[in-house]
Amino acid sequence: MGLPEERVRSGSGSRGQEEAGAGGRARSWSPPPEVSRSAHVPSLQRYRELHRRSVEEPREFWGDIAKEFYWKTPCPGPFLRYNFDVTKGKIFIEWMKGATTNICYNVLDRNVHEKKLGDKVAFYWEGNEPGETTQITYHQLLVQVCQFSNVLRKQGIQKGDRVAIYMPMIPELVVAMLACARIGALHSIVFAGFSSESLCERILDSSCSLLITTDAFYRGEKLVNLKELADEALQKCQEKGFPVRCCIVVKHLGRAELGMGDSTSQSPPIKRSCPDVQISWNQGIDLWWHELMQEAGDECEPEWCDAEDPLFILYTSGSTGKPKGVVHTVGGYMLYVATTFKYVFDFHAEDVFWCTADIGWITGHSYVTYGPLANGATSVLFEGIPTYPDVNRLWSIVDKYKVTKFYTAPTAIRLLMKFGDEPVTKHSRASLQVLGTVGEPINPEAWLWYHRVVGAQRCPIVDTFWQTETGGHMLTPLPGATPMKPGSATFPFFGVAPAILNESGEELEGEAEGYLVFKQPWPGIMRTVYGNHERFETTYFKKFPGYYVTGDGCQRDQDGYYWITGRIDDMLNVSGHLLSTAEVESALVEHEAVAEAAVVGHPHPVKGECLYCFVTLCDGHTFSPKLTEELKKQIREKIGPIATPDYIQNAPGLPKTRSGKIMRRVLRKIAQNDHDLGDMSTVADPSVISHLFSHRCLTIQ
């Protein structure tokens, strides 16, 4: 497995680009010697030794790492028990069951009291507007988390209760999630870009007792009245027979009138006035965050939890359309995110880390909040977007805080590539040491630009493959050890045993392409789908008994490098966010004009993939630009702006098999104007296809 070290060469600007573009996968880049010298894992040989031990002796490997954390009581029985084979009984995974700990205690109290990091900055907060900044130390964060833990307890929240959080990227979001963890309640964070319908659905699915939200926030130029959306969601919950008893509201846009701007422990006042924001108030349900915090004590004993107690629920799109509540547990998740953060980003105490992901996604949970804090890191917490107020924003923040490790999505890289090198190169970026990508496979052109322009050919790139379900990185380079190939996630992380299977479930050796699966558990694996263990078993373990099935296709090359080829199921990856085709289709057919809908992915130069929708109209309705806009609006309201389609085509008929199944592979070909359709023997009405080709939308590649 892997490349002989002597065959590996460093990249050399444009020549490297040409070779990567034409020669493709043979090209590789060695880790810079100055990175390897100080790295936790300094060579490919050392990586292989550690990986072999982690897979062959997982109990000993992770047992040693567990000793670095505080346990109220040790593990009384087996360190690991599991079953991955549905034919042998119920699927279960148990790491350190019976041991008790608290993740909030481990990431805050220990750093403040044992490691004496109380005065170290935990987060530099950078607001939407440049100049709108604050910072919060580990001690200040601990005090605020204890205060809000007491607030939650006073509201009757107990261990095992679920709390919904619907907030922008502000320090109170981190405080809220850690307070839940401190008292043993499960946080269910809903991305603030999701609609009220999506929020309602998630509150109902996990029966959340309480909602935490914000008055409003700006995303670039756009004002988002989050409280209004939260009110709509709570009204929908009430109508469906589930009244949420309490909603705690952070006054974010109204901070100036609270006089909170000078305190380092609070986010500062917004610089842009919002006289037009009307915040409705529901007496008896709504409570102001700042008023509750003023009355709360600043000490709070943590709730000691079993390692296998649930820590949080995070919803991810499911191929059936209904989102799945992914459940992660206290002990295993803590070990895994702390360890992946330390090794994948080669973290050292003086680093300033910046993950641009929103905490509403798993990347934000693992690598904005829990992973960095578990390592005592200083991070940047960014509320804004890469292009506001201009395309210099990310690089000016890198220079401002002297960011050393930078983690973002290929979508952001492709977006910024469009504006050329100058907005990047006019900033120093001298502090950068490691670059990372997450959310989707990165195309080689974007990788090369990231390496050459952003990293000035001196920063290793960690191209990380993982999922909401895995908790942390699964396939990834290590900065000081792994020769990089543009577009490859390279090799498995510690404890990860990948395999590639064919359709019959046989493991393929050497160069191969097929289904990516994992053969044994790692501590960060999800334990169940909330309230639906059967769905957990069916989705991830039924197709190939004995394996965790990712749903992704994968190639392994002659050097043993893994290349993710994309989703095999009916899922789309838009700007690094997984969307279900079924979810979008059902939002379309809810419109009175639409009889039937089919949604496929289409290549997009910035998003990676975008939505191309085919709609069959009901009798009496005509296709028009007005209808197209109505359908887009409907999807935004039902799911959120992230799911807005780029293309909607009128389809008087859809290609179907004789049994009535929509042939989505044919629709994908039509969307891309690719007439090489393959075997069409099962199509019921071939004339439908020629009509769709002749009326397809004009697309960009």
From Swiss-Prot:
It is an enzyme of class 6 (ligase). Belongs to the ATP-dependent AMP-binding enzyme family. It is found in: Cytoplasm, Cytosol; Cytoplasm; Nucleus. Residues 1-41 are annotated as: Disordered. Gene3D superfamilies: 3.30.300.30, N-terminal domain of ligase-like (3.40.50.12780). It catalyses: acetate + ATP + CoA = acetyl-CoA + AMP + diphosphate; propanoate + ATP + CoA = propanoyl-CoA + AMP + diphosphate. Inhibited by acetylation at Lys-661 and activated by deacetylation mediated by the deacetylases SIRT1 and SIRT3. This is Acetyl-coenzyme A synthetase, cytoplasmic. Monomer. Interacts with TFEB. AMPK-mediated phosphorylated form at Ser-659 interacts with KPNA1; this interaction results in nuclear translocation of ACSS2. Interacts with the 'Thr-172' phosphorylated form of PRKAA2. Interacts with CREBBP. ATP binds at G439, E440, P441, D463, T464, F465, W466, Q467, T468, D552, R567. One of its GO terms (cellular component) is cytoplasm. The modification Phosphoserine is found at S28, S30, S36, S263, S265, S267, S659. InterPro entries: Ac_CoA_lig (IPR011904), ACAS_N (IPR032387), AMP-bd_C (IPR025110), AMP-bd_C_sf (IPR045851), AMP-binding_CS (IPR020845), AMP-dep_synth/lig_dom (IPR000873), ANL_N_sf (IPR042099). Keywords: Acetylation, Activator, ATP-binding, Cytoplasm, Ligase, Lipid metabolism, Nucleotide-binding, Nucleus, Phosphoprotein, Transcription, Transcription regulation. One of its GO terms (biological process) is ethanol catabolic process. The lineage of its organism: Eukaryota, Metazoa, Chordata, Craniata, Vertebrata. One of its GO terms (molecular function) is AMP binding. Reversibly acetylated at Lys-661. The acetyl-CoA synthase activity is inhibited by acetylation and activated by deacetylation mediated by the deacetylases SIRT1 and SIRT3. Pfam families: ACAS_N, AMP-binding, AMP-binding_C. NCBIfam families: Ac_CoA_lig_AcsA, PRK00174.1. Its EC number is 6.2.1.1, 6.2.1.17. Catalyzes the synthesis of acetyl-CoA from short-chain fatty acids. Acetate is the preferred substrate. Can also utilize propionate with a much lower affinity. Nuclear ACSS2 promotes glucose deprivation-induced lysosomal biogenesis and autophagy, tumor cell survival and brain tumorigenesis. Glucose deprivation results in AMPK-mediated phosphorylation of ACSS2 leading to its translocation to the nucleus where it binds to TFEB and locally produces acetyl-CoA for histone acetylation in the promoter regions of TFEB target genes thereby activating their transcription. CoA binds at R219, G220, E221, K222, T363, S575, R636. The modification N6-acetyllysine is found at K418, K661. Residues 1-107 are annotated as: Interaction with TFEB. Changing T363A: Loss of catalytic activity but no effect on its nuclear translocation upon glucose deprivation. Loss of ability to promote gene transcription for lysosomal biogenesis and autophagy.
